[in-house]
Swiss-Prot record:
Lineage, opening ranks: Bacteria, Pseudomonadati, Pseudomonadota, Betaproteobacteria, Burkholderiales
Domain of life: Bacteria
GO cellular component, one term: ribosome
Membership in a protein family: Belongs to the universal ribosomal protein uS8 family.
NCBIfam families hit by this protein: PRK00136.1
Task performed by this protein: One of the primary rRNA binding proteins, it binds directly to 16S rRNA central domain where it helps coordinate assembly of the platform of the 30S subunit.
Alphabetical list of PANTHER family matching this protein: 40S RIBOSOMAL PROTEIN S15A
Species this protein is from: Bordetella avium (strain 197N)
GO molecular function: rRNA binding; structural constituent of ribosome
Annotated SUPFAM superfamilies: Ribosomal protein S8
Subunit structure: Part of the 30S ribosomal subunit. Contacts proteins S5 and S12.
Keywords, comma-separated and alphabetical: Ribonucleoprotein, Ribosomal protein, RNA-binding, rRNA-binding
Signal peptide residues on this chain, from the entry's feature table: none
Protein name: Small ribosomal subunit protein uS8
Length: 131
């Protein structure tokens, strides 16, 4: 069966793995998922990630991060979805928890955080919120 929203599936796998204290989580890989994992690593929400498997069926393995026995990611939720795309201009990109969290935005210059998008003066599709 085909997956209608692979990004929501990625976020759900991360959320579920952290609820049962898993150290790693595996999922099918794509360029967009790798870009999101890169942003999560740069922002300190995950320890690392690695693309494994064959060229025909690559798999993304994410190593989750915990602090004092609790997951670093407290909240991770999908914003724009296939049935309702959410686009924001450069001046309307939302802040998550007054800047304590990040919104991951897909722009014409690549996938980046809300702060970086505002600094570069670009808007785009708001993929998810992470706090």
């Amino acid at each position: 069966m085909s997956m209608s929203d692979p990004i929501a599936d990625m976020l759900t796998r991360i959320r579920n793995a952290q609820q049962v204290d898993k150290t790693t989580v595996n999922m099918p890989s794509s360029k967009l998922k790798v870009a999101i994992a890169t942003v999560l690593k740069d922002e300190g929400y995950i320890d690392s990630f690695e693309v494994k498997g064959s060229q025909a069926k690559p798999e993304l393995e994410i190593t989750l991060k915990y602090y004092a026995g609790r997951p670093v990611i407290e909240r991770i939720e999908r914003v724009s979805r296939p049935g309702l795309r959410i686009y924001k201009g450069r001046s309307n990109i939302p802040q998550v928890m007054n800047g304590l969290g990040v919104a991951i935005v897909s722009t014409s210059r690549g996938v980046m955080t809300d702060r970086k998008a505002r600094a570069n003066g670009v808007g785009g599709e708001v993929l998810c919120y992470v706090a």
